[in-house]
Amino acid sequence: MASIEKLPMLAEGQKMLTEELARLKAERPLIIDAIEEARAHGDLSENAEYHAAKERQGQIEASIADIEDRLSRAQVIDPSMLSGDKIVFGATVTLLDDDEKPVRYQIVGQTEADAKTGKISYNSPLGRALIGKKVDDEVEVTVPSGDRFYLVSKIEFI
């Protein structure tokens, strides 16, 4: 059953989902053709091509339904339109770690999250710990390697 809870994301995340949906919908008729071709080869009980195509069709249909659900619940947020002194979805934050080394993250949705580029999900342990914090607040996050401590040094809405 689909959820009716709003799903915050940036315009970039919405674009990524829309492009993936278009790609999957374009693949859909190709899979149907592959199923028909495999079906023409006879006995379906031992037809690996048929079963692989049917499995791929199921994956595509599930992915399409998931993306359509997420897009229907999307609440697109433009960080440049936000302001305030607390960390919220879309904010870009500069933190000082245990070594006083600055690290910078933007709080984003699950679709856009990519730690390598400094984008963390609001649902991640660090994202959850940061939401609502202000400059000079300390943040403690438990990660597999132990507890990490950060100091919020800057909040930007860019």
UniProtKB/Swiss-Prot annotation:
Gene3D superfamilies reported for this sequence: Transcription elongation factor, GreA/GreB, C-terminal domain, Transcription elongation factor, GreA/GreB, N-terminal domain
GO molecular function, one term: DNA binding
Entry keyword annotation includes Manganese: no
GO BP term, pick one: regulation of DNA-templated transcription elongation
Coiled-coil region list: 17-75
Keywords: Coiled coil, DNA-binding, Transcription, Transcription regulation
InterPro entries: GreA/GreB_C_sf (IPR036953), TF_GreA/GreB_CS (IPR018151), Tscrpt_elong_fac_GreA (IPR006359), Tscrpt_elong_fac_GreA/B (IPR028624), Tscrpt_elong_fac_GreA/B_C (IPR001437), Tscrpt_elong_fac_GreA/B_fam (IPR023459), Tscrpt_elong_fac_GreA/B_N (IPR022691), Tscrpt_elong_fac_GreA/B_N_sf (IPR036805)
UniProt cross-references to HAMAP family, sorted A to Z: GreA_GreB
PANTHER family linked: TRANSCRIPTION ELONGATION FACTOR GREA (PTHR30437:SF4)
Similarity comment: family membership: Belongs to the GreA/GreB family.
Free-text function comment from the UniProt entry: Necessary for efficient RNA polymerase transcription elongation past template-encoded arresting sites. The arresting sites in DNA have the property of trapping a certain fraction of elongating RNA polymerases that pass through, resulting in locked ternary complexes. Cleavage of the nascent transcript by cleavage factors such as GreA or GreB allows the resumption of elongation from the new 3'terminus. GreA releases sequences of 2 to 3 nucleotides.
Name this polypeptide is given: Transcription elongation factor GreA
Organism: Rhizorhabdus wittichii (strain DSM 6014 / CCUG 31198 / JCM 15750 / NBRC 105917 / EY 4224 / RW1) (Sphingomonas wittichii)
Gene giving rise to this polypeptide: greA
